Amino acid sequence: VRPVKYFNIKGTFNWGEYTSKKLEGGEGVGSGDYNPMNRYVVGAWYDNPRGLNLRAEYGHMKSRVNKTDVVKENGAYVLAGWHWGKFLPIVRWDMYEDHVNTGTANNYNRILIGCTYSVFKNMKLQVNYGHFMYGDDARKGLGYDSSEQLQIMGLFKF
């Protein structure tokens, strides 16, 4: 849905099934040939190619087998940026929660600062710095409460 210029509202819902696979060292997720999986995502974007860029999304995924959650995850982000000539600097907050595997790095809040530079139409360079913060269960499992990430990328369209 596009109620006004540059603004989009989107959503998706997936209902389906997946199969468990035998993995080296044990069984896969679930309990049989067909395990239910539901997923939805909703989001809103405002992207003026000569100015403000705002985005937000929320997603949820769940699979329950024999009254037990085998997948129960939430994710969200909010992004703000400004198109400034060939540059697009941004700041972003995102989070992910895994309610089944609570002691893993899948449970975080992150603040990201980045910038994309459009070299020309089909080539962009991007640099991002992310600071991850982990909840109590993840801290216990990981042995640390935060981590850093530096990402440098080239994006090419052919």
Language model features by range: what are they?
Residues V1-P3:
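Long hydrophobic alpha-helical segments that form multi-pass transmembrane helix bundles
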